[in-house]
Regions:
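Short, well-structured segments within or immediately adjacent to enzyme catalytic domains
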Residues: 1-119
Length: 119
């Protein structure tokens, strides 16, 4: 689940938290659920924030021919194909997993659909 939805996270310092569906300015723009890479699962939420030079805190899955499913706040689903080979990571059952950078087009796409700036 997108860390910007539901109970407030102390880790969110740059993105707005959506407590209710009414708080989402454009429900078709922001995802609620995403498939997380098995090697990246470490808690119940999916964080998309900048972590130093590494773009990903949690890494999305690529189970669908180099693509990942996203469920948006308006209830539509998108299967998004990844552009960067760095996002398509084989499952190794090892944690942690680090991939991509803030300049990565896949990270940017995901980040832009996580929330809006501000608290």
């Amino acid at each position: 689940m997108n860390s910007c939805f539901g109970p407030r996270s102390q880790d969110l310092v740059t993105l707005r938290q959506f407590d209710r569906l009414e708080d989402v300015p454009d429900a078709s723009r922001y995802f609620v659920l995403v498939e997380e890479h098995p090697d990246s699962i470490n808690d119940p939420t999916f964080f998309t924030t900048f972590q130093g030079a590494n773009g990903w805190v949690d890494v999305p899955a690529s189970h669908h021919e180099r693509a990942c499913n996203f469920l948006f706040a308006d209830a539509h689903v998108e299967t998004h194909p990844w552009q960067s080979a760095r996002t398509v990571i084989p499952v190794r059952f090892q944690f942690p997993i680090l991939s991509g950078t803030a300049k990565d087009p896949d990270f940017r796409w995901t980040y832009e659909r996580t929330s809006i700036a501000g608290r």
